[in-house]
A protein has these predicted regions:
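Short helix-initiation/N-cap motifs at beta->coil->alpha
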Residues: 82-93
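Structural motif corresponding to the C-terminal cap of alpha-helices
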Residues: 37-41, 76, 152
Length: 201
């Protein structure tokens, strides 16, 4: 869809706290790593299967998953078996209980990383829906988030978030894919409409 932008790290491009991170795309090296790890391709070219869930009302996610399914099997021999939940509640139960291999979700970053991004990686939000669903835990990352949210100097805060983005991307905490644009439709007679999330809700 128009307006979608690729993401290479935890804070989306366009945010004042975004910093570029180095996430090289190297399928050849990925294949070498999988070979060394003891996952050879079988006669069908498949190394192993990963079951991947998604929130069933998010049709945009399903479209991306079908594309990734073809790309992963072709480039590195990993097959994604897409599992569709009967309803959003069933998906939520799987995610919060940890009964899944991988899940894909559309998360909203809000206007500040302390509100919208920290919850995705903080140890104390593990297993909470639309928060740290992967159960990721790193005390150093927790400390960086606390320092960044308390930092009053904008430049100092940006430096802390830059360090966080580099750390999280280096640890491959998630596979960040893209942004999803939101549109605000208004009558031309309505003036001074805020374009920030708390203004349009």
């Amino acid at each position: 869809p128009g307006g979608v932008r690729p993401m290479y790290g935890p804070i989306p491009p366009g945010s004042e706290w975004h910093s570029p991170v180095s996430t090289p795309y190297d399928p050849d090296e990925a294949n070498r790593i999988l070979d060394r790890a003891g996952y050879p391709r079988n006669e069908n070219g498949i190394r192993f299967t990963v079951e991947i869930d998604y929130e069933p009302s998010a049709q945009f996610s399903l479209s991306i998953l079908k594309y990734l399914q073809s790309q992963f099997i072709r480039t590195i021999g990993v097959y994604f078996r897409i599992r569709t939940a009967e309803d959003p509640g069933s998906w939520a139960d799987r995610v919060t209980s940890g009964a899944f291999d991988v899940t894909m979700d559309e998360l909203y970053g809000w206007h500040d990383p302390a509100i919208g991004i920290e919850r995705i990686y903080a140890t104390n939000t593990a297993a909470i829906l639309w928060s740290n669903m992967s159960h990721y835990s790193n005390p150093e990352v927790d400390a960086l988030f606390r320092s960044a949210s308390a930092e009053k100097d904008p430049e100092g805060r940006k430096a802390l978030y830059a360090a966080l983005q580099e750390r999280l991307s280096r640890e491959h905490v998630a596979l960040w894919l893209c942004t999803i644009p939101y549109a605000t439709i208004r009558n031309r007679n309505v003036l001074h409409v805020a374009d920030q999330p708390f203004g349009v809700l």
